[in-house]
A protein has these predicted regions:
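Conserved ATP-binding TGD loop and adjacent catalytic N/P-domain core of P-type ATPases
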Residues: 1-123
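Bilayer-spanning, highly hydrophobic alpha-helical transmembrane segments
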Residues: 122-130
Length: 130
């Protein structure tokens, strides 16, 4: 399930949760996410955008997964922005990819697949120079 996905992702990535909601969801998220995951609540769209910019200024590559139009600025600012949608016709136009909400548990698989694709592209480019 989701807890297993986040445990797997935690091994290779820093997970941070930015939410526009209040802290009423803290206990639910803490039960679902790996221990030590940074949770930041009551975030306005501008604050999410600034948070992403600050991470990038620290030299980090940022992938953001968002579910609403209020995430558009942060999705556009991130190195990779993924919009989660239950209806693929309703999504943020600022994203790089759209992921059907029912497929969210496959996020790690898609990330591995994209890394393999990048490796293939780099190898093909190198071979084309020979």
């Amino acid at each position: 399930g989701l807890a297993q996905l986040f445990d797997t992702l935690k091994k290779g990535y820093q997970i941070k949760v930015l939410s526009g909601d209040n802290e009423g969801e803290r206990s639910t998220l803490e039960a679902l996410l790996p221990k030590g995951t940074e949770l930041v609540f009551n975030q306005k769209p501008e604050q999410k955008l600034e948070f992403i910019k600050n991470l990038q200024q620290e030299g980090k590559n940022v992938m953001m997964v968002g579910d609403g139009l209020n995430d558009a600025g942060a999705l556009a600012q991130s190195n990779v922005g993924i919009s989660i949608s239950e209806n693929v016709n309703v999504f943020s136009p600022a994203c790089d990819a759209i992921l059907d909400a029912s497929e969210f548990e496959k996020l790690n698989y898609f990330m591995k697949l994209s890394k393999k694709a990048i490796t293939t592209i780099k190898m093909s480019f190198t071979l084309s120079l020979l």
